[in-house]
Regions:
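A short, well-structured alpha-helix characteristic of acyl/acetyltransferase catalytic modules
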Residues: 1-27, 31, 155-158
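Short, conserved alpha-helical segments within structured domains
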Residues: 18-22, 43, 114
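A short helix-loop-beta-strand connector motif used in the catalytic cores of GNAT acetyltransferases and
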Residues: 32-46
């Protein structure tokens, strides 16, 4: 995690958290994640290369709105693996699991408008663009930014 994406400011520039300064930052967050697995509603996965099992990213449910049977997903992948279809394949698999095993009705994702590549992943996965949330996001610098929101319904993929 540290070597493949967390320490690289370029890799996390469209995320809400800063690049890890050293391996101890990564250990701290990994321990927090492990602790969250005690919660039955924790959905967090590593993204690995099929041939080597090298960890190159993560994808997880960052918010659950139970009354609406909705969840929101967040993801990150090493820039070394951008534009190779890996995130699209990963997102499709996670959406399938969340719809068919967990039972969500709606899945949504957001991205900073400065990062249209993330939106292209969402569209490739069948998500619908819903609009811009003005100054909804906060960059890892603390600056507010506009975010685009996409969603997909379970009925969209039947």
């Amino acid at each position: 995690m540290f070597d493949n994406w967390a320490k690289d400011p370029e890799n996390v520039k469209y995320l809400s958290w800063q690049a890890h300064k050293d391996i101890n930052d990564t250990y701290k967050i990994l321990n927090e994640w492990i602790d969250k697995y005690k919660n039955k509603n924790c959905y967090k996965w590593c993204i690995t290369l099929k041939d080597t099992n090298e960890v190159i990213g993560s994808i997880d449910v960052i918010e659950i709105i139970e009354i609406r049977s909705t969840c929101e997903i967040g993801y990150v992948i090493s820039k070394k693996y951008w534009n190779k279809g890996i995130m699209t394949e990963t997102l499709r698999a996670v959406m399938n699991y969340l719809f068919n095993t967990v039972g969500f009705n709606r899945i949504q994702l957001r991205h900073m408008t400065e990062n249209p590549a993330s939106g292209r992943v969402m569209v490739k996965c069948g998500m619908k663009y819903e609009g811009i949330l003005r100054q909804y996001g906060v960059k890892n610098t603390g600056e507010r930014c506009d975010t685009a929101i996409y969603s997909i319904l379970k009925s969209d993929i039947l």
